């Protein structure tokens, strides 16, 4: 396994399964193509290219002709990834194709935003259409609880990540759900599973930090139908929320790539989506899936942060203790988990030092002021 990553050392680079890390910090798309070709030559043979974020999936699909000379690619058509990764385009396609989704609006000016907020009420959801173009560290989705907050966000709607989308908030009482699957060239699902999101981070609008593989034939059939209407090929990660008002599974997000929690869906034979991608791309048969319903996954550090804010801490402890899969901890590959711990400790020490320094400065300032 080779990884093309940014300049900062990531905990995953410590993995015993990683052959080599290749720094990738391109100036533009042309530069990225050049760097990927250099990586291909270093590897020495055609390797399977597996994007792990929306930007990579869109780039790989739209430059498939150039990349296919050096890499083996999954089957997405060039237009599909952008049309589902772009949340504004996804919403328009859902409306046109009759796919249930949350009511969404695209205000341009504060007056339009106020009218939308009057219709949707509070809280509502604000999200950026093209989150892969956001500055590092900026949240792509958040709950809006007041007009002033919406107006501040609206100021950035003309930026590359825009437009800003204001969306009806569907309460999670009927369940937060997701579906991961792989669809072949003919649109047939070779492997897939429905997951229940038990804990998200940030709460209500964030990604899965505690999830479970569940038997939900209704959602699986719905996800297959959604994929067929959208023309999905290859791997996909879809987020749904069941609407308590009408019982629909509303599609909230569609990522044309491996989902971060794909290892949740490791079946009783050890088959997961990464292996399915490799088998399909190499022309080999994909075995019949053997679902492992009840299998759970936890993202350690963010789950613990969420647990500290929960009134039911004991239930969180039990879920953590009984998890089958973790984002970082693996008994056969401990180095990434250790590296993550070191990074967390370093950040904590840095915060403590800065806090102590700030307190000392305030104390000196108060002493000087008192002396005068």
Segments (PLM) and residue ranges:
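Active-site nucleotide/adenylate-binding loops and adjacent lid/helix of ATP-dependent enzymes
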Residues: 81-165, 170, 185-188, 217, ...
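Glycine-rich phosphate/pyrophosphate-binding beta-alpha loops
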Residues: 198-202, 206-210, 255-270
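ATP-binding N-terminal substructure of ATP-dependent carboxylate-amine bond-forming enzymes
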Residues: 1-76, 111-114, 342-372
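Phosphate-binding site of ATP-dependent enzymes
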Residues: 145-204, 214-226, 241-245, 249-250
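Flexible, glycine/charged-enriched surface loops at secondary-structure junctions
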Residues: 165, 233-237, 287-293
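Conserved metal-phosphate-binding beta-hairpin within the catalytic cores
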Residues: 228-263
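Peripheral (often C-terminal) accessory segments that flank ATP-dependent C-N-forming ligase machineries
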Residues: 276-372
């Amino acid at each position: 396994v080779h990884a093309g990553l940014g300049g900062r050392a990531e905990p995953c680079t410590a993995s015993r399964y990683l052959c080599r890390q290749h720094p990738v910090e391109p100036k533009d798309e042309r530069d990225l193509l050049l760097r990927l070709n250099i990586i291909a030559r270093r590897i020495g043979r055609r390797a399977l290219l597996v994007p792990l974020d929306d930007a990579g999936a869109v780039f790989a699909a739209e430059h498939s002709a150039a990349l296919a000379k050096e890499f083996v690619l999954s089957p997405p058509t060039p237009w599909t990834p952008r049309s589902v990764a772009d949340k504004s385009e996804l919403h328009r396609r859902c409306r046109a194709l009759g796919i249930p989704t949350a009511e969404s609006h695209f205000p341009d000016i504060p007056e339009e935003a106020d009218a939308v907020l009057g219709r949707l009420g509070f809280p509502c959801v604000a999200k950026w259409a093209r989150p892969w173009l956001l500055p590092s560290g900026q949240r792509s989705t958040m709950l809006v609880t007041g007009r002033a907050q919406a107006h501040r966000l609206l100021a950035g709607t003309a930026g590359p990540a825009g437009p800003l989308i204001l969306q009806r908030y569907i309460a999670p009482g009927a369940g937060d759900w997701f579906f991961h699957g792989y669809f072949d060239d003919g649109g047939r699902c070779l492997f897939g599973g429905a997951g229940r999101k038990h804990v998200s981070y940030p709460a209500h609008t964030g990604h899965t930090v505690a999830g479970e593989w569940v038997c939900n034939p209704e959602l699986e059939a719905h996800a297959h139908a959604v994929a067929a209407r959208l023309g999905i090929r290859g791997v996909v990660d879809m987020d749904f929320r069941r609407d308590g008002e009408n019982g629909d599974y509303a599609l909230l997000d569609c990522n044309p790539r491996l989902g971060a929690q794909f290892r949740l869906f490791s079946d009783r034979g050890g088959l997961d989506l990464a292996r399915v991608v490799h088998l399909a791309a190499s022309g080999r048969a994909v075995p019949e899936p053997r679902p492992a319903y009840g299998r759970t996954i936890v993202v350690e550090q963010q789950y613990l942060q969420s647990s500290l804010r929960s009134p039911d801490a004991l239930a969180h402890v039990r879920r953590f203790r009984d998890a089958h899969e973790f984002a970082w901890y693996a008994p056969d590959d401990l180095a990434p988990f250790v590296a993550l711990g070191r990074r967390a400790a370093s950040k904590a020490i840095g915060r403590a030092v800065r806090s102590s320094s700030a307190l000392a400065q305030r104390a000196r300032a108060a002493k000087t002021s008192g002396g005068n």
